[in-house]
């Protein structure tokens, strides 16, 4: 799990809620996945970028739970931000990459509420950023 790049923490527990700060799209080599959907990347590439964000979310959850994912009761919400052109309208399909990964790992308890938001820019030029809220047992 990567450390934050600003004045905030990667995770915070409040009661039974675990908040995960936004995780940006990073490939398997640790390189940022950059670019704008609808210009530099297609929907499938965006889906894969969102999936990478979700992998980082799971890594942060695991670290916050001291290595024990069984401490997670459910995923409450994902918010996905997609760096996209004005004409790109497939943000939900992009963020499915994150949703599908979370559900594949946590099963029914991974089903969550969600927002998939278009933005004209994201930090460091990345293509996708996703944050999350989980409920702990």
Label for each model-derived stretch:
Residues 1-137:
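Short, polar/acidic, helix-capping and beta-turn segments at strand->helix junctions
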